[in-house]
Amino acid sequence: MGKITDRVEDLAQPIVESQGLELVDVEYVKEGENRVLRVFIENPEGEVTLDHCENVSKNLDEKLDEVDPIQESYILEVSSPGIERPLKKKEDFDRFSGKLAYIKTFAPVSGNKEITGIIKGRDGDNIKVLKKDDDKELEIPFSQIAKAHLMVDFDNITG
């Protein structure tokens, strides 16, 4: 499935950028009997609006029909990444420094393959994280990150 998502990313990137938005992620999954192509976009200037999603969806749908990288039928969904936004690029760890994140690694880092902690930025190709459970700072090679996303920090919600 990686080839499909890579191809869709290549098609979606210029469409998303032409609207002043950023492409966060592309997923192609099976849900029940349906195949779903999800494209997550972000507005660096603020919120992603319904108009943003509609415009990207319309333009991307036209491009997908033209190029036809997916042979089977599917549902196209375009949305914001939500509160638990995936962290896919090294720059995401700079941008979201100070935020709580979940990180799963390919191999154990200091005995852990699953780490929850505060992002402290990065040092070159290493992501710095302050573990939530013991306040120990870890450096995780970016190449070892299998999956990462922001988390809601319920301990620091004020209201």
Curated annotation (Swiss-Prot):
Highest taxon, organism lineage: Bacteria
InterPro entries cross-referenced by the UniProt entry: Ribosome_maturation_RimP, RimP_C, RimP_C_sf, RimP_N, RimP_N_sf
Cellular component GO terms, alphabetical: cytosol
Main location per the UniProt record: cytoplasm
UniProt keyword list: Cytoplasm, Ribosome biogenesis
GO terms, biological process: ribosomal small subunit assembly; translation
Cell location: Cytoplasm
Family to which this protein belongs: Belongs to the RimP family.
PANTHER family recorded: RIBOSOME MATURATION FACTOR RIMP (PTHR33867:SF1)
HAMAP family: RimP
Biological function: Required for maturation of 30S ribosomal subunits.
Protein name per its UniProtKB record: Ribosome maturation factor RimP
Lineage: Bacteria, Bacillati, Bacillota, Clostridia, Halanaerobiales
